[in-house]
A protein has these predicted regions:
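Phosphate-binding/switch loop-helix module in NTP-utilizing enzymes
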Residues: 1-24
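Non-catalytic, compositionally simple segments
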Residues: 21-168
Length: 168
């Protein structure tokens, strides 16, 4: 079942975003993907073959989440927000301003509020890649795209607070 080029087997296998909303949707689809990975991918190389799996956790029983928890693999899970703001009251106030659609300049007013309270609002925060997405940018995404998308796509934590039995 191993793959080879002449007498050589691959020394690196790269899996990039192989899961999508459809193939993690049902237990049967997740089982098939896991079986393919265990029987085909992990057996395609040799003892020296490295497997690099890059992706977003779309379901708690997804292949990626299972690989992350498998002691056979060295795994690293990244989150856009490493630590949240300490001062949640200011962020709640900012959110009220940002989401006030009766105010035509709500985004500018929210930005002004943030700039006036920036030091207090950023207290305790840490983000993965500040140059790409600041904490402010990430909070805009969280509000505009919703917590379910934010948690799954940027935090690698597929929690949808609207469908959770207990709100985290």
């Amino acid at each position: 079942r191993g793959r080879r080029h002449r007498n050589w087997r691959p020394d690196l296998i790269v899996l990039d975003d192989i899961e999508n909303d459809e193939n993690v949707n049902t237990p049967e689809q997740r089982r098939k993907l896991k079986s393919w990975f265990e029987k085909a991918v992990s057996k395609a190389g040799d003892t020296y073959t490295d497997i690099m799996y890059i992706g977003t956790i779309l379901h708690y029983d997804s292949l990626l989440n299972n690989v992350l928890q498998n002691p056979r693999y060295k795994a690293k899970k990244y989150r856009a927000v490493i630590s949240e703001a300490v001062n949640t009251k200011l962020w709640d106030e900012w959110e009220s301003i940002y989401t006030n659609l009766f105010d035509e300049d709500h985004e500018a007013h929210a930005r002004k509020f943030y700039e006036e309270h920036e030091a207090d609002m950023l207290l305790g925060t840490e983000v993965l890649w500040e140059e790409k997405l600041s904490y402010y940018d990430l909070m805009e995404v969280k509000i505009s795209e919703g917590e379910a998308s934010f948690n799954s796509e940027l935090q690698n934590d597929p929690i949808d607070p609207d469908n959770a039995t207990f709100n985290p």
